[in-house]
Amino acid sequence: MAAATASSALKRLDLRDPNALFETHGAEEIRGLERQVRAEIEHKKEELRQMVGERYRDLIEAADTIGQMRRCAEGLVDAVQATDQYCARLRQAGSVAPRVPRAPQPQPPSEKFYSMAAQIKLLLEIPEKIWSAMEASQHLQATQLYLLCCHLHSLLQLDSSNSRYSPILSRFPILIRQVAAASHFRSTILHESKMLLKCQAVSDQAVAEALCSIMLLEESSPRQALTDFLLARKATIQTLLNQSHHGAGIKAQICSLVELLATTLNQAHALFYTLPEGVLPDPSLPCGLLFSTLETVTRQHPTGKGIGALQGEMKLCSWFRHLPTSIIEFQPTLRTLAHPISQEYLKDTLQKWIDMCNEDIKNGIGNLLMYVKSMKGLAGIRDAIWDLLSNESASHSWEVVCQRLLEKPLLFWEDLMQQLFLDRLQTLTREGFESISNSSKELLVSALQELETNNSTSNKHVHFEQNMSFFLWSESPNDLPSDAAWVSVANRAQFASSGLSMKAQAISPCVQNFCSALDSKLKVKLDDLLAYLPSSDTPLLKDTTPTHQPKNSAFDRYADAGTVQDMLRTQSVACIKSVVGCIQAELCTIEEVTREQKDVLHSTKLHAVLFMARLCQSLGELCPHLKQCVVGQCGGSEKPAREARALKKQGKGRAQDVLPAQAQWQGVKEVLLQQSVMAYRVWSTALVKFLICGFTRSLLLRDAGSVLATATNWDELEIQEETESGSSVTSKIRLPTQPSWYVQSFLFSLCQEVNRVGGHALPKVTLQEMLKTCMAQVIAAYEQLTEENQIKKEGAFPMTQNRALQLLYDLRYLTMVLSSKGEEVKSGRSKADSRMEKMTERLEALIDPFDLDVFTPHLNSNLNRLVQRTSVLFGLVTGTENQFASRSSTFNSQEPHNILPLASSQIRFGLLPLSMTSTRKARATSRSVETQAQVGPPALSRVGDPTTHPGSLFRQLASEEDDSPAPSLFKLAWLSSMTK
C-alpha cells in the first residue's frame, strides 16, 4: 500500500525541475525520491528485458552475433591498417635515412603499458573461453586456459598477499571480480573431467585429455591417474547395477555392464600400457596415449608445433602482438616427471580392481536376474552378451589386450555370469515344475471328487469313466482324424491320435483331458527352456571345447547344455513323481476306506481307483513332452532303443550301453506302471472278493434243490470193454460236458467286470495276479467244501460219486481256464499247484477207482473241447496259449471246430467265430438231464435281469434253430453244443 502511494505521489511530481524539487523537499526526502526513481527504473528494465527476451530472443542473439562479427571485422581492418602504416614508415625511414643511429626512444613505457593492457584484455576474455571449452567437452583446453589465467595472475601480481594495494586493481576494479570467478574454475574442470571418466561411450583421446587435466590440476602421478580411472569406472558399475529395473531393460543393463568392463580394459591398455623396448607398435592397438598426450601438452616446442593455450581467433586480435613471449608460448608443467607405469604394477592393479568388482557384479547381476521370469529371456540376455563379446573379440584383438594387461584371458561369461544364469535357470525350472505339479494335483483332486459324486448323468465323460464299455462302443466325430482320407499315416503329425486309437487303448476322456492339460503345461515349459539349448540339429551332450569354437566366438554358449538338460530331467522326474506320490496317497486313503466295506464293487471309490490306474498307465504315452523333458531333444525317436534291443538279441548289448537319459525314462515308465498295477490291484482285489463270495456261497449249498439247480448237461457214451473171457461188452457211461452254473456265472461275471473297465488294455501282470488270486480263492472254497462234507449235517445232500465227478470236472475246468501255462513254465511248481493236487486227490478219492480210470480219458476230452468252445466267451480271462488247439495226429474230422469259414459274400456277423456245419454223428448223445438245464442258475451276478445269466443268449439262439434244410451261412451248431 505504501509502495503504491509513493508511486502515485512520484507521478504527480515534476522531476524535470530540480530547483522546484529542492525548494519543496528536504535532503532526506530527496534521497528517498532518488531511491524510488532508481527502483522504478530497475523495475521497468526488468519488465522490458522479460518482454524482449520472450518475444525477440532470436533477434537479440542474431544482433549480438552481428555485433561480434562487426567488432571482429573492425579489429581486422585496424590490424591491416596498422600493418600498412608500419610498413609505410619503414619505407620512408629507409629512403630518407638508411642508417640512422639509434636514439633513445620513448616507446618502452607505452609498450609496457600496451603489454599490461593486452594481458588484462586476455585475462578478461579467458573465462568465456574456458566456459566455451567446457561446453565443448574440451577439458584439456580449459585446463590450459585456467593455468594460463593463474600465470597471468602471478604476472600481474593479482594473487599476491598485498593484492588489494596493487595499482592495477586500483585502476581496474573489475579485475577483483574476475579473480574471484577464476578460483571456481579448478573445481569445475576437475568435476567435469571426473564425470567424463565415468562415461563409457567416450573415445580414448577424450579420456586421455580428461586424465591429463586431472593430473595438471592436482599435480598427480600416472599411478594416481590409473587409480582415479578405475575408481570412476567402479562407480559407473555401481550406478548401472542400481538402476531401476523394467523388464526388457535388464538385458540392456547387463550388456552395458559387460561393455563397460570390456571398454575399461581396452582403454586401460590404450592409456596406460607401454610397449617394451624393441617391440614395434601395432597401429590397430594404440597404447601409451596418456603419456603421449602429457608430453605434447607439457613440453616446450621451439618450432611452435606444440598444443598452446592460445589458439584460434585470439591470435588475430590487434592486442595479441603486445603479449609477452612467456604468455604466447605458455605450456603447463608437472612438478614430477610422468614415468610410465610398469607392466607388473599395471597387472596387479587391474587384477585387484577386477577382484574388487567381482563380488559387486555377481550380487548385482544376481539381483537383476531375479526380474527375468522366463528362460527365453535368459537366453536372450546370454545371446546378447555373446554377440557383444564376439564383436569385441573380433574388432579389438581382445585376447592380445588381456594377455598384455593380465597375462591371462579374462572370461566374463565363465568366471562371472555362467553360474548366475544357471542358478536362475534352476530356480525358474524348479518353480515352473512345482507349479505344474501343484496344478496337476489340484486337477487330480477335482477329477476324483467329480467321479465320487456319482452324478454320471450330468457329465458324459464321468459316465464313460464308470463304465468303459459305453465309451468303447459309442461313436463320436473324433474317432477318425479329419484328414484321414487324404493324409497318410507317415505324413501325420508326430503326436496326432484319433479317437479309435484312444478306444483301442481304453483311455477314457477324463484321462485324455488330464493328460492333455499336463502335456500342454509341459510343452510351454519345454518350449521356454529349449530357447536356452542348442537347436535340434546340434548334438545336445557333445563335449565342446573352446578350441572347437569359431575364431571370433567369445565363449561357448551351449557349454552348459548338458547341465541344463540334467536340470530339466531332474525337475521333470521330480514333478511326475510328485504327481505319482499324490496318486499313491489317494490310493492308500481309498484302500483303507474300502477295506471294511462289503459291497465295494458298487462303491464310487473304485471309479476313482480305475481313473488313477488308467492315468498312470497312459501318462507316458499321452504326454510326449514329458518324455522330451526326460530324454531330451534327440531322445524322442525310438531308434536307439531298437538298436539296443537288436544288440541285446545278438548278445552284444549290455546294460551300461543304454544312455542314462533312456534309463531314467524307463525308470519313470516303470514307476508309472507300478503305480498303475497297484491301483488295478485294489480294483481286482475288490472284484475277486465280491465274486468269490457268491461263488463260495453257491458251492457250499448242500441241500438237494441247490445241487439240482446248479447241475448242467451230461453226455451218455457207449464204450466197449473186453471181459476176462475175451468177449467185448458194450456199456453206457454218463459224464459231465459243462461246468456247473455257478462256475459259468463266476467266469462270465468276471469277464463282464473286466470288460467294463476295458479289459483288452489291462496290464498283463494285473490279469495274471487277478487270475492267481481267483484260483487261490477257488481252491480255498473247495477246501472249505471238503472240510464241511466231513461233518455230517442233517438235511445235507450226501457227496455222491456223480457230484464228486461234477466237482472234479468244475475244478479242473477252472484250473485250465484260470491258469497260465507260460507262467507255470517260468515259475515252476507253485504253492497253488500243490494245493490243487491235494484238492484233486480228495475229490478223486470220492470216486470209484475203476470208474475213474474209465472216465478219465473221456473227461479230459470233454474238458479240452469245452475249453476250446469257451475260449472266445471267456477270452479275457484265458491265456492266449489256451485259445488255440494244439495240432495233434489224433484229430477227429467229425468233431466241430472253431474256425472261420471262407465265404464269397459278406456275412452279417463277420466277427463271430462260426464252426463248420458237420455234426457229431459218431457219438451217441443223450439229453436225459435236459430238464435240469432249463432251470435257471442261482443269481450270482449283481444284476437281477435273467437275460444276463451265462448261456441265456445261446439258449435263445438254439431254441430258434430248426432242422430246415435251407442253406445258411450262420449255423448255430457250435452254439447249441455249448449249451448241451
Curated annotation (Swiss-Prot):
Record-listed N-acetylalanine modification sites: A2
Keyword set includes Protein transport: yes
Record membrane topology: Peripheral membrane protein
Chain intervals for the UniProt region annotation (Disordered): 923-950
Disulfide pairings: none
Membrane-spanning parts: none
Stated name of the protein: Conserved oligomeric Golgi complex subunit 1
Organism: Mus musculus (Mouse)
